[in-house]
């Protein structure tokens, strides 16, 4: 145990993360309060043992306070990836702008896991002057501040009520009763550490799971009557009637079936993610578009509600379309090449439309649609306006991203060049000349 503690301390010193030191400082404050409360109630015995723990707590407080203000890397040779997130003020501003969109957002927010879309819609344009201008953050400064956008006032009030009631219950029970057991002190300090993390660090599965587990164990221990911490209490549950036995069996079978179904669905999602990653790797390393299409298509079939797979599938078909166009420039297109071109275009458009149907507020889906139609401008009538509409929709969903406006400007240039090329052709019809003259003027 002591070896694990020393190793943990060394890791903290090497990483030197401010939020971790702050959480540890608060945890040691809680332990110091528990120690002082018990020391004032008991007679002065085991002085040496108690002094050792007092000095240990004081050392932990001093060390964590020291490293909270030491921001210089202690080991410059060890490189860590930068951990970047929006500031607290920026996250709160995005939250209030999201709530002001409509009445539903005011009470329940934009929905779980949608902060990335809120960030794209309401981020400060000044972020474009920084190196992270192209990064779309999936979470804000912390879990609690992110909830303001995703779950609204009802969500954040519920979480704050959970934290407040839990802390009041814990400290009221600890203050009224003796907490001689080391387990109770450790759980109280750990609970303070994890709940504070909700306010100063983005949410992740591990921290959330640990927070609820520690909170549940601590509540269970504190609400026991006079049983010792590691005591065993007998509880019995009996079903004396056939109907109760039948109902219990039915619930058990339902839960087992639900568990099996959940495992099956998660296994499919895992396989889909694995095949998708392999397909992208193959495309990057070998440039084999057909194999990539097969792999991404398999992922889209296994996880049909994931718009990312459909978007990447559309992009893969777009690469195939572009390769067919490049090959047709070298010679007169044969009927086979024309058929391949039509199939690739139809597949790209179909996958792109599927991605948009799955997630209409994803700007990347609309940008993919714009890039497909942009490629088809010289070849397919009406593709020009479709490209403009798609890029315009993308810019409305991510108004502070300059890339969408660059895409839109490039599209107008292609339209203008296409119109000029058609005007230069001797066999251009009067209707085509009139149509593309108007397009060129507007572009």
Q: What would you call each of these model-derived segments?
A:
Residues 1, 22-35, 159-163, 169, ...:
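Transmembrane alpha-helices of multi-pass inner-membrane enzymes
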Residues 264-285, 297, 301-336, 358-378, ...:
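Amphipathic alpha-helical repeat scaffolds of TPR domains
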Residues 299, 354-355, 393-394:
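Canonical positions in the second alpha-helix
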């Amino acid at each position: 145990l002591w070896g694990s503690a020393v190793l943990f301390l060394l890791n903290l010193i090497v990483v030197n993360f401010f939020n971790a030191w702050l959480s540890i400082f608060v945890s040691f404050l809680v332990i110091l309060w528990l120690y002082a409360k018990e020391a004032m109630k008991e007679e002065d015995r085991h002085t040496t043992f108690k002094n050792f723990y007092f000095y240990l707590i004081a050392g932990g407080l001093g060390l964590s306070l020291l490293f909270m203000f030491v921001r210089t890397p202690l080991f410059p040779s060890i490189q860590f990836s930068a951990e970047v997130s929006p500031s607290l003020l920026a996250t709160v501003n995005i939250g209030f702008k999201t709530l002001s969109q409509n009445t539903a957002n005011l009470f329940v927010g934009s929905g779980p896991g949608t902060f990335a879309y809120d960030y794209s819609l309401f981020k400060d344009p000044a972020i474009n002057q920084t190196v992270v201008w192209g990064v779309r953050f999936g979470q804000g400064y912390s879990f609690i501040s992110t909830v303001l956008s995703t779950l609204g006032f009802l969500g954040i009030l519920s979480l704050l009520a959970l934290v407040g009631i839990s802390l009041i219950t814990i400290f009221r029970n600890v203050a009224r009763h003796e907490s001689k057991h080391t387990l109770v002190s450790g759980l109280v300090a750990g609970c303070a550490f994890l709940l504070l993390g909700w306010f100063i660090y983005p949410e992740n599965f591990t921290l959330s799971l640990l927070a609820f587990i520690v909170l549940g164990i601590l509540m269970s221990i504190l609400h026991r009557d006079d049983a010792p911490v590691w005591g065993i209490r007998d509880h019995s549950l009996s079903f004396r009637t056939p109907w109760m036995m039948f109902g219990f069996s039915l619930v058990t079978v339902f839960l087992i079936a639900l568990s099996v179904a959940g495992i099956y669905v998660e296994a499919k999602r895992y396989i889909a993610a694995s095949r998708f990653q392999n397909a992208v790797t193959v495309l990057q390393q070998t440039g084999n578009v057909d194999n990539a299409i097969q792999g991404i298509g398999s992922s889209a079939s296994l996880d049909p509600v994931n718009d990312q797979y459909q978007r990447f599938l559309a992009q893969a078909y777009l690469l195939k379309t572009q390769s067919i166009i490049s090959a047709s420039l070298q010679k007169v297109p044969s009927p086979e090449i024309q058929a391949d071109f039509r199939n690739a275009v139809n597949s790209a458009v179909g996958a792109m439309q599927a991605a948009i149907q799955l997630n209409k507020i994803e700007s990347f889906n609309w940008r993919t649609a714009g890039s497909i139609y942009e490629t088809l401008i010289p070849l397919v009538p009406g593709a020009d306006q479709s490209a403009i509409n798609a890029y315009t929709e993308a810019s409305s969903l991510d108004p502070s991203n300059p890339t969408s406006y660059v895409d839109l400007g490039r599209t107008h240039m292609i339209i203008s060049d296409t119109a000029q090329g058609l005007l230069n052709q001797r066999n251009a019809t009067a209707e085509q000349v009139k149509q593309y003259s108007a397009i060129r003027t507007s572009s």
